[in-house]
Regions:
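Phosphate/pyrophosphate- and phosphate-bearing ligand-binding catalytic cores of soluble enzymes
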Residues: 20-21, 26-138, 142-162
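A gly/ser-rich beta-alpha-beta helix-loop segment of oxidoreductase catalytic cores
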Residues: 1-15, 85
Length: 162
């Protein structure tokens, strides 16, 4: 996965990574050989990253701390951090934001069993305390259908169902 937020991504800072592949063979690859793209990398689900060398930008300690506090507050204000979730449920589609499309379809607060489209941020599916994997799967499918029916865009889940 090429995780990212607030204008930065792992592809921007990864110099190299060491990992175990599915055959438990230790491998190493340079950052530019990891096939990073939007929310994707060449790592397979069975690969385990053991370590990574990251190249970060130097900065003034207090400025970095202030930026961290700013981003933490921004997340608290806009994301449902008070409930369990798997984070962002859908990848950003071309031409818009999944959360805006879900909200536009009137799905904030929509529930299937114990799974709910967050009322705080429509891009998150939260667990109200008793959600099953089936609840989450059905909710994701319902959201995809509703958004597709309204916009013609099929949202791609960011959550990997195992």
């Amino acid at each position: 996965m090429n995780a990212g937020a607030y204008g930065g991504e792992m592809k921007d800072v990864t110099v190299q990574a060491e990992y175990l592949d599915g055959d438990l063979q230790r491998r190493s690859a340079a950052g530019d050989a990891l096939g990073f793209s939007y929310r994707h990398s060449r790592f397979k689900p069975e690969d385990v990253v053991l370590r990574a060398e990251l190249r970060l930008r130097p900065g003034e300690r207090e400025a970095i701390r202030a930026r961290c506090r700013e981003l933490t507050e921004k997340r608290r204000a806009s994301q449902p951090l008070d409930l369990p979730s798997a984070g962002s449920a859908f990848k950003r589609p071309a031409g818009g934001y999944a959360a805006a499309m879900i909200d536009g379809a009137g799905l904030k607060g929509y529930r299937v069993g114990g799974a709910q489209v967050s009322e705080k941020h429509a891009g998150f599916v939260v667990n109200l305390g008793f959600a099953t994997a089936s609840d989450v799967k059905k909710l994701l499918e319902d959201v995809q259908k509703a958004v597709y029916d309204r916009t013609g865009i099929l949202l791609e889940p960011e959550i990997k169902m195992l």
